Design a protein with these regions (language model features):
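PIN-domain endoribonuclease scaffold, especially VapC-family toxins
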Residues: 2-3, 17, 23-91, 103-113, ...
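Asp-based phosphoryl-transfer active-site loop
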Residues: 4-13
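Catalytic metal-binding/acid-base residues of hydrolase active sites
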Residues: 11, 118-119
Length: 130
């Protein structure tokens, strides 16, 4: 079974019909869910996704969604953190949250689903580079 790591922007836009990227997130994620791909996300993505809902006291909606799609939150261990640092070293424009998201996907042998075209290009570059 294929593994799919979610970036924060996908989860946020998927769940917010008013988000400018909602339709894009739905069209990108729904077929992958239908295909039964195993869904993972880094602990840092989970934290990022929860900030606004916790403030608004709507955080249960996020947990219900993640439970419904059987998403696994993956802790960031030392090797993954080091990989994130290496990614930042190779790609100077990469922000730490994005580096952690991509590093978690790589460590989990998963494709990272993101709406960030820059991050997607970096992911493709990393796949092509041995």
């Amino acid at each position: 079974m294929a593994r799919l790591a979610l970036d924060a922007d996908v989860v946020i836009a998927f769940l917010d019909a008013a988000d400018d990227q909602h339709e894009r997130a739905v069209s990108a994620l729904r077929p992958r869910l239908t295909a039964g791909e195993e869904i993972v996300l880094s602990a840092s993505v989970y934290a990022e996704v929860m900030v606004r809902p916790i403030a608004r006291r709507t955080d249960a909606k996020i947990d219900e969604f993640l439970d419904a799609i059987n998403a696994t939150v993956i802790a960031i261990d030392r090797p993954t953190a080091r990989l994130a640092a290496e990614l930042r070293g190779r790609h100077r424009s990469l922000r730490l949250p994005d580096a952690l998201s991509l590093a978690t996907a790589i460590a989990a042998d998963a494709d990272l689903l993101t709406l960030d075209t820059r991050l997607d290009r970096i992911q493709e570059h990393e796949k092509e580079t041995p």
